[in-house]
């Protein structure tokens, strides 16, 4: 055989490459299994297009059985014979699986041959099916022998067909059925060999062609086999003929069918059926008996059966009545009526009553509907319900109540007699399952269940097993018959339901369900009584269950087998052709087939490949679920619906719907004139009996135009024929069928809903209008989507709940996450038309948009079951969108949870606390399947209560509790940031709910049972059937194809990435280690488990995935890093996956030459030929130093952000108690310290983790730049007319953070958040300032554009007002805006036309003036409290320098004014002495705005007053002398400085008596100096710096402490900010000379009080006070109350003079000791070596300090206390600043409120004035009219002078007048306040009827008189 193949290839190589003839086709590729190529020989037309072969080659190509035989030597042939048979598998069970001999059923029929040559020949064929016979050429010596090995199994031969021409296919009249035996390995070894022979008379037959193919290809291929046979003649390979046949080749298998989890839903017991029969309507809206049925009058069998049935029923009931021992006078109808009454009473707990009485509520005025205010919403709903009460009550019918809501029948009480013989208290049901239409070996198989109570839902967890023997085709064609019986009913009437369920596809989708049909006895009774058409609207319940198939055959044959059984009815269609295929993307060729769907099942034709003009000529057979022939009724036929034909196109990686059409069964039996069609003779084949049978039937032949789901201009037409086998009209006796009704939206609705559907739609539209849901000024605004009808793929309009139904998920999809994953595996597509696909169509076409995925997912979730809904709304771009919502009850938090499942992105949004009444949700979620009905009943009861319908007080607990204990909150808060702009409606398979709350889904309460929040479209509890039939999900992708796809993906991705990098001159290295591949695949498997895990298993799956990540990263070498990308795809197309990886994975283009790539692929096979593909690609590369630093910096930044976010969450969780108690600075400081501590700890932890992320990396030095955040960051903006500028006050303090945020991103985030929540387009909002120090973000909202949309057309003022309301909730929503604001934000806006920048500038100006006067009450420079100095930070110093430069210009301008003012004051007061106290009092005055830092009584007092103190000439001379002394003797100054540093604090003074007085350290807060004085000051500073450098060599570590050094000889202008005693601070005194200064003696212990610097300052102030005569200054300033009070509060103590003397003496002693110490230190320094200078100085210093132990202890304690006070002061300062800012904001807010209130007050006053003007105008007009009437002539005296005013009533005449206050609820006898009006005087009218009659007569007489006069 191999030699033959080589010969053929050599011959083809010699053929010249010329275009082939039209009649020639290329030979198909040979299949696997060693089959040889088809060869044939025939003379073509002249042999054109081929080169003649050599004669020697032609002689070798003998067409006999030895053609292509293998050649062996004799020894090789012997070895071939002795070779043992092949085995496969390692374990014994696996070897047995492959080599076990099996039975296969083979049927070959419909064999045809078509001649492609011009010559006619008589043909016959031989088939060798299986066998191992093989011919071999054996070289034995010089001869060549032909030997045959193996054996034949099945040999078939057809009859001879004469004169086979090329006119068309010729039937060979051959049909054969037999059994083949062989193992799975035999299918691979053995072949089917077909030989085509030409029959010749009087000579040998001629072999025309030979065909071979492995049996495995036939066992896995299609049933329709079509092959072309070729042969060589005259050197040309031409097509000889084509053979086609049907081959049924499937394994006989023993299937174990397990029936588990079966139940009955909404069944009606026998008594309920009898009650419904008794109460049924008489021919309501139906056809009459004669018009619909038209029975043959000679059908006596049915009449006899009916009479016998009624007799049996009567006899059974009489027997039961006698057993019950009825009371005298009690008859059966009365008992039945009593049962009905009791049943109605039991239904009353749900609010259903057969007769509902409405109280006389009177008529409501429709004017109440015109109000659109929110507070009138409930009133509007009540008015709408009252107006449409007839519609609501008409659609709410008791007779259509789903049986699932019916209450259980009353059970027998204890003590009641059981003589009736019943085994149970209530109705008991049982179910019988049997196989129908099965093969002869399976007939009689069935199961009978045990009895269950009929109340509720009868369930059977395990019914048993049935062992079915047959092929997969036999199992698919089998139906199971389900009969439900009520064992307590009479024997004749026990059957209460009947159904047939096809087992087609049960091996792939094990869930079965069907609607129960009419019982046989009821169908017979309705047929004989003439109301059979009414049964179409009756629902007898549903049966559901699961059939598990334990084991399956390995191989499965594709295609259909057209076979009919004589005991059932079939619908047969012969699909001919389609004139032209129109594809959506204009494909040149396509593989197509036709699928026929009818009666809950579908069949398909064979696939015609590579053509746009397919010709099938194939028959499709569909079994019909009908009872026995004579039991078929008219309703059984009409309720079947339409027959649909769909043309599908398939190819590698795509499925297209190429059009569809439909017809009805009525068209098969009747023509266009409604006459019966003629009978036509047809034939059918019985494969089991291998016979052909003839029958007569009516044939419908037509052509229909296909309807497309895509837009197409070209038409496409399909031709087909249809008939039934046998003819239904003949076997059932039905003479006439009703004409098919036009399919509408309400065709399958229950009667009550169908009759009121249009009115319900009008009511729905009215609710939308009255609620103002489409009003652009309220709520979210348009566009909104409230449609309750959708257009499906067949261009039919359907009610939204009919698009959803309960679908049991396929096996393995058993959780909400797995359902979500399965739906996302359906590819997404963009539709050209607005069509909605049904779930089964979306799975079949394997594509859809968000709406299709949401409907599919909701249907699957309902089948779990779950509380699921389809949500329809809009995205932020205002496009329509759909997603899925599920309701859950959280037992831990005792709250309701809503989950939004976004199918497009794969994200799940969880919203907690979204139910005001979680208790009701808890009760309803316990039964998700039927809890929705109970929830609808709650809403129904509320609606009926509005209508005034009496409801029984015995209400279930879950209904009575609804509405109680509600969470009184306007909107829910918190939750994830949603991508949805509005939520408009929700629907599932039960109803549609309209959202009448706020449109934003984040602000919606999901208590859909509350009529005030959700409007229910359909008031009744109707069970609406779906508009489609659930047919399962189909098979999975074949295993061999699946395995090959995985290998193709991996190879394609490797080659494409390598080629892609090669185009960029980059090398690619792949790590193909087996261990690594297995480990990566394990990670993908864990990822899939986490994506599909149940809620209770999710944490475990996530933990396993985290452990895998840690193990993976732990194997990374040092100084290397790994970057990976896990990707998911819903296809196995290798090109699509490869292109997506290259486009989306950035590190594919990595230029690092040390990079190694790794790849892993994992595929999951899902039902419906869906695939879930996971790909993980990673790269390992060496990390450079620059890259390492960048990575660490990014991780450090991320760690800081995480720490800050964590701290903010902790603050929000703990509350804002510090903000409420702002005056308590100590608590605020502690809180700030804790926050910084948490942030620092988190940052350190994250930093350590980041350092470990890169192996072998060194930790970089952490440099934190203080003061990096500016106070204000700005950018430009354009302010036009109509722009509103405002600010957002945030809680986050950016100014205190280490790094400044990205200003551009910050502004973009703010703009995006405002635009998103206001629904504005980008560019309308402009954020342009970030005032970090003030915690404000300034933005502007521009005016609307001319061509703006409806949402953008809103004015800026309205947007600001709306933003004021929603801004706090925006800050609470998780997202970027929450991070920016810190969880809290308020709007600062002063009203229309204002600019917040003006307000900010005013605040800054006010703050600047207060700073000059009071320094804001907060110290901002180096300050000293209790001897401890607080040094300002570097960032503050830099800011101070900038401020100094900015303020210099302002100060110079003020300087001139101040000088003039000082001169004027001197002239007025007569001298400097009189002016000084006033200046001091002005400085000591409290600030205008009270600061919250009351606990820190800091009062600013400059050493030299800000107004400038003019000293006397004598004093100036003294100062000059002191300066000279400084220059002459530095040794005298140094001890003074040392004493100032080392001096202990003086005698402690109580803090309450001596508050700290802060003195400014420089000219910024003190006196402004002259230019000359500044120069001298700079010289002094340089001089002191030099002295400090010298002292640093001699002094110990005193300068590292926070103690301020005071130089005794310095001027007051340059003295630092220090606290002074209050006794000295109230007045100014001249500085004492240096000789008078006394240093106090050291104390043994450190005590709180004034430091040494304060003591020296006190001495200096004391001497100045003495020289300036303190008594005279105080007496001169006694007139000022403020200064007097200040002086009294700061008065010195009585013992101050003695303390000063002691201090001076101690200072002198200390100065002497310091001089001696300096001398010793200088000597020691000279003796030390230069290399150990520092060491010797420390030793000498230590010896000096150790010379006095008390000094050392005192110094250490003083240093520790100073540091502690410094830290405490910093905290206090920050607290004071924060409190001051809060007070400023509060004052600003109060001012804005006052301005707004004033504006409103002005508006009210204006309205009041306008109303007064209108009142005056009305009074004037009334007076004019009255004068005009007075000027008319008076009437005659006999006229009546009274007119009666009454309330409006309904009268026959027109005497009633309209009163201003109408009361329609009063009766005629209850009228009051009637008055008679006569000559502008009124009095009470008489209420008697006589006075009314008299008044009426007078009025009529007046009218007559007036008529006569005119």
From Swiss-Prot:
Q: Where in the cell is it found?
A: Membrane
Q: Does the keyword Chloroplast apply?
A: no
Q: Where is the composition biased (Basic and acidic residues)?
A: 1-28, 414-423, 1192-1205, 1215-1228, 1569-1584, 1701-1711
Q: What does changing residue 124 to S do?
A: Results in impaired host cell invasion and egress due to defects in microneme secretion
Coiled-coil boundaries: 1766-1828
Entry-linked Pfam families: C2, CEP76_C, CEPT76_peptidase
Any one GO CC term of this protein is: membrane
* Comp. bias regions, Low complexity: 1239-1257, 1405-1414, 1492-1502, 1550-1561, 1620-1629, 1675-1698, 1712-1722, 1729-1747
What else is noted?
Vaccination of mice against the protein elicits humoral and cellular immune responses and contributes to a prolonged survival time during acute infection and a decrease in brain cysts during chronic Toxoplasma infection.
What name is this protein filed under?
C2 domain-containing protein
Q: Which source organism does the UniProt entry give?
A: Toxoplasma gondii
